Curated annotation (Swiss-Prot):
Transmembrane feature ranges: 3-23, 26-46, 55-75, 79-99
Pfam families associated with the record: Multi_Drug_Res
Subunit structure: The efflux pump is composed of GdnC and GdnD.
UniProt keyword terms in alphabetical order: Cell membrane, Ion transport, Membrane, Transmembrane, Transmembrane helix, Transport
Name listed for the protein in its UniProt record: Probable guanidinium efflux system subunit GdnC
An example Gene Ontology CC term for this record: plasma membrane
Induction (free text): Transcriptionally regulated by guanidine, via a guanidine-sensing riboswitch.
Cross-referenced PANTHER family: GUANIDINIUM EFFLUX SYSTEM SUBUNIT GDNC-RELATED, SMR FAMILY PROTON-DEPENDENT DRUG EFFLUX TRANSPORTER SUGE
């Protein structure tokens, strides 16, 4: 559940980052602002029970990979094998950080 908040925050990050580039009306700028608000709200909630450094690294890694992949799929950004390879390396690092990180309730041996 706690890591789910980080993943959901990263999804909203992808939305607002793409919005920064493509927003061109009050409606799309409003959507971008809403994405920023939800993204940071979920990020802050996740840091209440997970280490902030790891949460931020996972958040930015997922957001970066998601943004690049979204630009490729939705906006036909050029893609080559080096770009895909580096996204894969980034995701391996994100998964590794998640796997080696315990949340604070696990460290204390209790339920939050």
């Amino acid at each position: 559940m706690k890591w789910g908040l980080v993943v959901l925050a990263a999804v909203f990050e992808v939305v607002w980052v793409i919005g920064l580039k493509h927003a061109d009306s009050a409606l799309t700028w409003s959507g971008t602002a809403i994405g920023i608000i939800f993204s940071f709200y979920l990020l802050m909630k996740a840091t209440h029970s997970l280490p902030v450094g790891t949460v931020y690294a996972v958040f930015t890694g997922l957001g970066t990979a998601g943004t690049v992949l979204s630009e490729i799929v939705l906006f036909h950004e050029p893609v080559g094998w080096p770009k895909l390879l580096l996204i894969g390396v980034l995701l391996i690092g994100v998964i590794g950080l998640k796997l080696v990180t315990q949340d604070e309730t696990e460290e204390k041996g209790g339920e939050a």
